[in-house]
Amino acid sequence: MVPRGFFITFEGGEGAGKSTQIHLLADRLRREGRDVLTTREPGGSPGAEAIRHVLLSGAAEPFGATLEAILFAAARSDHVEQVIRPAVESGAIVLCDRFLDSSRVYQGVTGGLASDFMAALERVTVNGLIPDLTVILDIDPEEGLRRASERRGKATADRFEKENLEIHRRRREAFLNIAAREPQRCVVIDASRSADAVSENVTEIVLRVIFDRAGLSEPTEAGSV
């Protein structure tokens, strides 16, 4: 029987550096000979990517927050069953840019949807697949939006980046509240530092999770597990 892999999600506000950190971590793990899959939400599977365009373009906004949350849930369900679950069951390390915590924050806290409704959607869409580790990259929203704008260049900002600063501040607080409620799953990392400094911190934490699963007290040599 193939040992179960790891499911690691990255969360945080706009411009926190999630995609950058996933790329750096994936490179490090692959150099150690590990099987790594990188993916994102909304998206990650053909069906979910089609829904992603509708969601990020703002085309779903006229239909209201409830239908929009259902679209996010549909994308996640397809992503989980077509991509994430098979990869984890095959022994891969899956690194995902956003997952259930983003729905809790964006559609729940700042979208105004009831927590019991969001919890019901979550149960159906993830079907028991909860991340082994969630890395929350924490950054001041003003700095995050500045970085996002710099990264984007002349491209059009997506609908979430266009929202007012107070909403971004509420989202930051909501992510930190999730981390406080679920310390066994979540770790908060200061993302205001350089990408290399953040990457070093992320790698140390992820390797600790891997070594703990293997029953070793401390990493002794890269790639030895």
Curated annotation (Swiss-Prot):
<dbReference type="GO" id="GO:0005524">
    <property type="term" value="F:ATP binding"/>
</dbReference>
<keyword id="KW-0547">Nucleotide-binding</keyword>
<dbReference type="InterPro" id="IPR018095">
    <property type="entry name" value="Thymidylate_kin_CS"/>
</dbReference>
<comment type="function">
    <text>Phosphorylation of dTMP to form dTDP in both de novo and salvage pathways of dTTP synthesis.</text>
</comment>
<dbReference type="GO" id="GO:0004798">
    <property type="term" value="F:dTMP kinase activity"/>
</dbReference>
<keyword id="KW-0067">ATP-binding</keyword>
<keyword id="KW-0418">Kinase</keyword>
<dbReference type="GO" id="GO:0006227">
    <property type="term" value="P:dUDP biosynthetic process"/>
</dbReference>
<dbReference type="InterPro" id="IPR027417">
    <property type="entry name" value="P-loop_NTPase"/>
</dbReference>
<feature type="binding site">
    <location>
        <begin position="12"/>
        <end position="19"/>
    </location>
    <ligand>
        <name>ATP</name>
    </ligand>
</feature>
<comment type="similarity">
    <text>Belongs to the thymidylate kinase family.</text>
</comment>
<keyword id="KW-0545">Nucleotide biosynthesis</keyword>
<dbReference type="GO" id="GO:0006235">
    <property type="term" value="P:dTTP biosynthetic process"/>
</dbReference>
<dbReference type="GO" id="GO:0005829">
    <property type="term" value="C:cytosol"/>
</dbReference>
<keyword id="KW-0808">Transferase</keyword>
<dbReference type="Pfam" id="PF02223">
    <property type="entry name" value="Thymidylate_kin"/>
</dbReference>
<protein>
    <recommendedName>
        <fullName>Thymidylate kinase</fullName>
        <ecNumber>2.7.4.9</ecNumber>
    </recommendedName>
</protein>
<dbReference type="InterPro" id="IPR039430">
    <property type="entry name" value="Thymidylate_kin-like_dom"/>
</dbReference>
<dbReference type="GO" id="GO:0006233">
    <property type="term" value="P:dTDP biosynthetic process"/>
</dbReference>
<dbReference type="InterPro" id="IPR018094">
    <property type="entry name" value="Thymidylate_kinase"/>
</dbReference>
